[in-house]
Amino acid sequence: LSSIEGAAVTAVRVEGVLHEFSPIPGAMEDTTDLILNLKRVPLKMHVDHPKTLLLRTSEPGEVRAKHITPDPDIEILDPEAYIATLGAGSTLAVEMRVKPGRGYVSADKNFDEDLSIGWIPLDSVHSPVKKVNYFVDQARVGQATDYEKLTLVVWRNGAVSPRDAVGLAAKLM
């Protein structure tokens, strides 16, 4: 189930920030916290090539995923996902590179030569399935009691239904 294709933020560029350990002018979070929050935003892509999303806001207060400029090819599954808190008189401008993929991809592999200076490559988890648990119970069919029933509990980010996740995983096998 961890090998199902999904989408993730693979690189970011924050206006006024030189590297991932820099503070963000006017924001409560530093760049590392902002990156962690962006990686938690659940996404679903309708294309199979990288896309760039833009977040630009000057509204003081909490910045949420709903502030990201909409793209017809990328669906933001939780518009209320928290990103940062912005102070009065500040502007937050973030570009995000979103790619489809499978499983975990390290920041080294997410580095693209075509990205200009200022982009920070990120490690990414593309799988829409977050966690799986299973139970095996005794089952009865007619008079026979020597059957077992498998119950799967699938936690996901909303990009795929539990039924589709299990179906896609079965196809991969």
Annotated model-derived regions:
Residues 1-173:
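Protein-protein interaction/assembly regions in multi-subunit complexes
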